[in-house]
Amino acid sequence: MTFSVTILTIFPEMFPGFLNYSLAGKALEKKIWNLEIVNIRSFAKDKHSTVDDVPYGGGAGMVMRPDVIGNAVDNVLSAHKNTRFIYMTPSGTKFNQRIAKELTEIPHVTILCGRFEGVDQRVIDVYTPYELSIGDYILSGGEPAAMVVLDACIRLLPGVVNNFDSVAEESFSYSGGILEYPQYTRPEQWSRYKVPEVLLSGNHRKISDWRREQSYVRTKERRPELLNGDDK
């Protein structure tokens, strides 16, 4: 099954961006996933292709118009009946590895990238998109956030990462969703620092136990909420 994505944006030239490189780019070439870009401005009705207007009630910034957004969304939904409609917004559910995995199991995903002060609330009320956030900070628009979500999803698709065990052992995927253990490679000694002896022992059980312990310690120190399930 190909993972298909439609992006709604006023800056179509931003895509595929960094998704055209490395693992995601190779997967795009192999058609493991595909990308459709819809320019929201093409659904505007005036000669200036206006997509925003001043907010009712006053306030700073501009708001994306519901009539223009609605026409663009209707166009996509009519072509993709079973799509999962997502809106990138700081007020959405915080994106995590579990959500990334869930999205890869859906054949088609549509992502609306907001700009300015966001979209008119009526768009949210009518289409009830899955509102997603990548963190508690503000970007200039939803496009970078959408790329982050897609990058996390694409690398989970079969055939993208050659050694799929490396994906399964990463942070948030490893041992119940906790942080990954520390990694080491050659040289065995760098400056005054040596690789932990257990990793050189060849004893796979001891190595596995060490990694599990290191993951737990690292998670307890840096992200204790993951141990309590508070970040689900």
UniProtKB/Swiss-Prot annotation:
The reaction(s) this protein catalyses: guanosine(37) in tRNA + S-adenosyl-L-methionine = N(1)-methylguanosine(37) in tRNA + S-adenosyl-L-homocysteine + H(+)
Pfam families assigned: tRNA_m1G_MT
The keyword S-adenosyl-L-methionine belongs to this UniProt entry's keyword annotation: yes
Keywords recorded for this protein, A-Z: Cytoplasm, Methyltransferase, S-adenosyl-L-methionine, Transferase, tRNA processing
SUPFAM superfamilies: alpha/beta knot (SSF75217)
Gene Ontology BP annotations: tRNA N1-guanine methylation
UniProt-annotated binding residues for S-adenosyl-L-methionine: G114, I134, G135, D136, Y137, I138, L139
InterPro entries registered for this protein in UniProt: Alpha/beta_knot_MTases, tRNA_m1G_MeTrfase_C_sf, tRNA_m1G_MeTrfase_TrmD, tRNA_m1G_MTases_N, tRNA_MeTrfase_TRMD/TRM10
CDD domains: TrmD-like
NCBIfam families linked to this entry: PRK00026.1, trmD
PANTHER family reported in the protein's UniProt record: TRNA (GUANINE-N(1)-)-METHYLTRANSFERASE
Quaternary organization: Homodimer.
Function: Specifically methylates guanosine-37 in various tRNAs.
Protein name: tRNA (guanine-N(1)-)-methyltransferase
Organism annotation: Wolbachia pipientis subsp. Culex pipiens (strain wPip)
